[in-house]
């Protein structure tokens, strides 16, 4: 890599199933990985020798299912006991364990059992995306804008930011995926003048968002947002997988539920069938020797696939209704419905949405897999002063808090301080008081959600305001100040008005939240893993080079024409050097140095033997 640091910030769409990276240098460029793919699987695999990330990890998943990790985005910022985590664990081949109610992933790596947090797995994917960008730019990348689902809560946003820090990135901003896609749409095809209401429908591999924006000139104002952080292509695959499992059991009497490898192979076939059914009405699925020597073969029609997923497809319209209701806008006032995310390629999803908007033509002008990274790269250029075009220079993003924020009051009633869909950054205040006489300490539990009963919402953290003057209940005036920054991350301060005593919390003690020490430790660990990966790659390369050189020397020695060029008395020396090099190659744990020395030694013997006779 060339010296120097990239002055801008890359845009990374950190997806559940695939990730994408873009840069801005005079214009946006989506960067392909070393396989030439513009999206990279969000997979990390661990083997006895190495760690693989991206395509290489996904390609070996069926052979190594228990140590191939994916779906980290479905774990990040969540508690172990959450319903979605427990149900996902039933479908994952890798092991998830409970560590103080935070989920950890357990794998075998370099011959040892190791555990990783979802943040660490995500950081490995982010590192991969950073390296893909660096290979193209030729400079070191230090800054990034990373996207998250609009409906991610505070804990999930903070955990994503931590993943960036572990990857050695300064995450300038966490932005919402549909908002990033809106930028890509707004900047495309000279659409930036007309004032319009745009609905972004973003259905990806694991998450679903709907955002309603008002775009006027370069000002993008999010009016409302809704979604489901646990709905996407993976769920459609799972339903199809269950259908195929039942078919296989009917035909053979065999149940593959306990076999991780068979499940992985069948899931891959289900995913392929799902994609094929977006363009044809019927497809055949074949998996040789799926389980116990039995082959699997089945025909699936698009109609059957739609039937299997009917309830999930239909559920995508609920957030659409919600955003219209929240923004107080009639569906007839929506100028464009923009499709984002790979799962919007499914014809039934498109039909339901078009029918909902009275047969409206859906907007498909942007690439559903790349739009989010595109928008993130534009935002990265703006934040680092690298944007050159007039239309990006004046671009302004006004996003919203996706869920209400507030405190738990007496009787577990949720006291909303920041209503959902409030434009961020924002500062909101609300006054509270004591519930008992002479109360000197007041606990402020901070929640996020839409339910009146606090237990139904997400507890983000809590803190105590001490030193409240002892007064009769109801007399002290306690003010809660909620500050939400542009990343959607919250800081809460409580002040007792008569004394000015205050206490505050940046929501950092939520379950699974990493301390700065833990992040630092993980950064160092990530460096070690990177060094181990590089050492393995060098050793692999040295082994391959030695192998290929041995092979070419063997050809020379056995070829009558070529061997005639070797000095008469030197042939034995070449053969001895060849035998020595071959024996080094046979040593499984031969070091990179030993392999290189063997190659140099053999080259020396050949050069001497071939020098003018």
UniProtKB/Swiss-Prot annotation:
Lineage: Eukaryota, Fungi, Dikarya, Ascomycota, Saccharomycotina
Source organism: Kluyveromyces lactis (strain ATCC 8585 / CBS 2359 / DSM 70799 / NBRC 1267 / NRRL Y-1140 / WM37)
Region (Substrate binding domain (SBD)): 403-613
Family: Belongs to the heat shock protein 70 family. Ssb-type Hsp70 subfamily.
Spans annotated as Nucleotide binding domain (NBD): 1-391
SUPFAM superfamilies reported for this sequence: Actin-like ATPase domain, Heat shock protein 70kD (HSP70), C-terminal subdomain, Heat shock protein 70kD (HSP70), peptide-binding domain
Any Gene Ontology CC annotation: cytoplasm
Name of the protein: Ribosome-associated molecular chaperone SSB1
Entry-linked InterPro entries: ATPase_NBD, Heat_shock_70_CS, HSP70_C_sf, HSP70_peptide-bd_sf, Hsp_70_fam
Motif interval(s): Nuclear export signal: 574-582
Annotated residues for binding of ATP: 16-18, 73, 205-207, 271-278, 342
Gene Ontology biological process terms from the UniProt entry: translation
Region of interest: Inter-domain linker: 392-402
